[in-house]
Amino acid sequence: AFDGTGTFTGNLGTATTTVADSVTMTAAYNVLNGKTVNHDGSESAQALVVTIASADAAADLSNITSDITNLTANFSETQTFIGNLDSKTASVANDITVTATAADVTGDTIAAAGNGNIAVTALHSTLAADLSGLSSSTGAVTAAFDGTGTFTGNLGTATTTVADSVTM
């Protein structure tokens, strides 16, 4: 059982891990991948924070089994994310840039702290992308449209660039 708020860096083995009431467990994706982390029998303010470092840029949060409703991700290093947030809310640390295709972040909620940045690529390949859940405190949210197409999605607050000789 995880009984006190903190960061776990060890090996969870094959056992199901439980998180006590009002406790936040933070661990790297490579520690939690393929594991089961649940609340202790009652859902009472537990939280599970999955840290995604650049080495885990292909992280697929659907590989973590959990009945904790407050399961979030935190991008801790600059990276090109090619994974799956599995509809979980994510944050980007201050001064970090996360780059991802529109297909990988459409419909997701990702908030960058301080000067954190979110750079969306291949917007032309996901013409109905919903970027309305992407935000940055004082950094930037950008989107690149590099092929001709009719965009029908939601750009949110993203500053969008359209490549030369391309129509959006």
What are these regions (language model features)?
Residues 1-168:
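Solvent-exposed, low-complexity segments and loops of surface/extracellular structural proteins
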